[in-house]
Amino acid sequence: MSRPSSAGPCASKPCGKQKQPPPPPPHAPSLPATISGGPGASAPPAPTAAAITGPLSQQHQELTSLFECPVCFDYVLPPILQCQAGHLVCNQCRQKLSCCPTCRASLTPSIRNLAMEKVASAVLFPCKYASTGCSLSLHHTEKPEHEDICEYRPYSCPCPGASCKWQGSLENVMQHLTHSHKSITTLQGEDIVFLATDINLPGAVDWVMMQYCFNHHFMLVLEKQEKYEGHQQFFAIVLLIGTRKQAENYAYRLELNGNRRRLTWEATPRSIHDGVAAAIMNSDCLVFDTAIAHLFADNGNLGINVTISTCCP
């Protein structure tokens, strides 16, 4: 059983008399107006901050606009390649093109634009999900990793399996589930019983149910799959139809109970942004094999007691 802990170190305030810091040096622009230098000249230093929150200055916005890809309008990031006339296109779009989208010149041979790469190292780029609410601007080396986990990226359908390709905003997830996955039932209350029927069905099977409490919807998922060859296992987990930050406010408890036996798991629910695949891969959920399932099952039906609670601040 794994119980998450919300305790952490307390912040302390400095006390006593402190020395006054020396006056700051005269203000210098954060970006050079021009780039010059002969052979062997080094690139301008990268900004010390890897990310900032909030709008960029007008000058900075004009500079980042020079890196816009004319095809997808995302930013052209290092390694930066140009056409024979000097026009830029991002690496993702370049792989699909045979000629420059701006001047129709050939994109081969590949010509590296080292000057723009040096400028890119001194610029912070807005997250690609800025239009949906993200206010972060990041160094180009940090941008892809952030965008993979950005809270403002589109939500995928949280149902197990890859058959549904729907994507949309968090506000539209429940509407999608209601209209496109009508077989999913919803129970209300903090304590419910998740009944999985016919657990002896062969092959990979999943069971899904919704639980509504604390003004939120939680998705209960039970999957049976052969994670290791010849060894079928069950994986049970709870997802919040919400953000990671919202999920941290709750805890869930899964319990198998019967025949004077008890098996429990307690954890923080995952956001549907994270999905169930990573949790199953890392066994970060309630895991039991078919032999244990049969100890708690009744005529091929398995009841899992599910309790949702709020975490103390």
Swiss-Prot record:
Name of a matching Pfam family: Sina_RING
ZnF segments: RING-type: 69-104
Tissues showing expression: Widely expressed in early embryos until stage 40. It is then expressed in brain, spinal cord and in the developing and mature eye.
EC number: 2.3.2.27
Name the record gives this protein: E3 ubiquitin-protein ligase siah2
Gene Ontology cellular-component terms listed: cytoplasm
Gene (name only): siah2
Region annotation SBD: where it falls in the sequence: 119-311
Binding-site residues, Zn(2+) 2: 157, 164, 176, 181
Keywords: Biological rhythms, Cytoplasm, Metal-binding, Transferase, Ubl conjugation pathway, Zinc, Zinc-finger
InterPro entries, per database record: 7-in-absentia-prot_TRAF-dom, SINA-like_animal, Sina-like_RING, TRAF-like, Znf_RING, Znf_RING/FYVE/PHD, Znf_SIAH
Organism whose genome encodes this protein: Xenopus laevis (African clawed frog)
Catalytically driven reaction(s): S-ubiquitinyl-[E2 ubiquitin-conjugating enzyme]-L-cysteine + [acceptor protein]-L-lysine = [E2 ubiquitin-conjugating enzyme]-L-cysteine + N(6)-ubiquitinyl-[acceptor protein]-L-lysine
Presence of keyword Zinc-finger: yes
Composition skew (Pro residues), residue ranges: 20-29
Organism domain of life: Eukaryota
GO BP terms in the entry: proteasome-mediated ubiquitin-dependent protein catabolic process; protein ubiquitination; regulation of circadian rhythm; rhythmic process; ubiquitin-dependent protein catabolic process
